[in-house]
Amino acid sequence: REAFDAGASVMHVHFRMQDEGMGHFPSWDPDLCEEVVDAIRASCPGVIINQTTGVVGPDVSGPIAVIKRIRPEIAACNAGSLNYLKLKKDKSWAWPPMVFDNPVEKIQKMLDAMDETGAHPEFECFDVGIVRSVNMYIENGMAPAAHYNFVMGVASGMPVDAKLLELLLGYKREGAPWQTTLIGRQEIWPVHQRTAELGGMLRTGLEDTFYLPDGERAGGNGVLIEALAQCARNAGRDVASPADARAIMQLGEEQHGSDGVENTSAAR
């Protein structure tokens, strides 16, 4: 609710298992997910729900079942595969090297479920090639329109770099909405500011950073959204209400279906 009051018009939601000691694992229990989303919608009238869908492997039945139950306005669509890697300080692997696999067949299943329920796909782009792939998905007819999320800061993906951001805009479809997800510490904030200046939507949350622009640790999503809203104002833009954001993203009327939350503060 603090994030909503600070200007967040979109809530990106991850669902977690509720059993003791299992809270770091995702849950695709439709009953649980519906309960969470209903509580968010009740507390934050008009807010736009953006559902996570990421799974490793070919089985997408879990996220698809949740899409069909909660009917989010937006659903993430991981638009390409990535070697998901990170090193510790001693240069050993932070976790066993893995592939976040998103072949076209898997993407198509997700897009079909989104089309069936009226959810708008948000294409998660981890590198330049994935941005270009999204353009091909649209040209091929896999999805009607592109909404890009440039994910920067994954250790084996695109770095948080304002110059790279400017290049990416030359590869997306003209006129298509876009935003950045920036992962890191206080070094991400100048790129949030550049996103605002270049006309992108602004997004942050404890999923991506624990730090405010001055390096202080954030006590919650609310203060992060306050800082993000200031980036919009610094760029001469206003913070969009949920109704404004629906119009900007052409989402239509509010959806209703039947725990980490990341928040987007759209600006106009």
Kindly give the residue locations of the regions a language model identified.
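Catalytic alpha/beta core domains of metabolic enzymes, predominantly
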Residues: 74-207, 218
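Conserved, mostly hydrophobic/aromatic
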Residues: 3, 14, 75, 134, ...
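Alpha-helix-loop-beta-strand connector modules within alpha/beta enzyme cores
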Residues: 22-51, 107-114, 167-175, 222-232, ...
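Glycine-rich, proline-tolerant flexible connector loops at the mouths of alpha/beta enzymes
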Residues: 9-34, 152, 210-214
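Short beta-strand segments at enzyme active-site cores
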Residues: 8-20, 49-53, 123-124, 245
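Active-site beta->alpha loop and helix N-cap motifs at the rims of alpha/beta catalytic domains
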Residues: 26-101
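Mid-to-C-terminal alpha-helical segments outside catalytic/metal-binding sites
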Residues: 226, 230-264
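C-terminal helical cap(s) of enzyme catalytic domains, especially alpha/beta-barrels
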Residues: 87-98, 214-237
